[in-house]
């Protein structure tokens, strides 16, 4: 497996993606999962990334502890509020800027995070959104008829969803 250099933002987006889909119980396990994705990382850098992302270890039902981003409280909120609250947090964490044109809202993310966020926006099924197209760091979100790109961008970035 060859590794490729990545930016800090792209690496952290990949860490968020892995922690979202896998119960990671150690930094060694996370490092191996990142290596499988082509990202070679030192323990010091991984530890710093986890700290910057606010990752915490939690233990559920007497089992092994595992990493989550945002802690047990956010997981509890996810169970109560469902995917929209998770989307709000993801938008807060991943959108670095936004713009609009016509009925399209454009969201800019760190490198490597756009497809992950666009996929989640599509899965949530927001009534104002027809669908998303994503590149590496840019998402075009198509608004339904009657809603402009400006209004959609404001809804997505101001927790109005």
Swiss-Prot record:
Is Amino-acid biosynthesis among the key words of this record? yes
Task: Give the domain of life.
Answer: Bacteria
Pathway in which this enzyme or protein is active: Amino-acid biosynthesis; L-arginine biosynthesis [regulation]
Assigned keywords, A-Z? Amino-acid biosynthesis, Arginine biosynthesis, Cytoplasm, DNA-binding, Repressor, Transcription, Transcription regulation
Q: What is its main location?
A: cytoplasm
One molecular function GO term is:
DNA binding
Any one GO CC term of this protein is: cytoplasm
Localization (cell)? Cytoplasm
Record-linked Pfam families: Arg_repressor (PF01316), Arg_repressor_C (PF02863)
Which Gene3D superfamilies does the record match to this protein?
Answer: 3.30.1360.40, Winged helix-like DNA-binding domain superfamily/Winged helix DNA-binding domain
Biological process terms in GO annotation: L-arginine biosynthetic process; protein complex oligomerization; regulation of arginine biosynthetic process
Record flagged with keyword Flavoprotein = no
Q: What does this protein do?
A: Regulates arginine biosynthesis genes.
What is stated as this protein's family in its record?
Answer: Belongs to the ArgR family.
Which NCBIfam families does this chain map to? PRK03341.1
Q: What is this protein called?
A: Arginine repressor
Name of encoding gene: argR
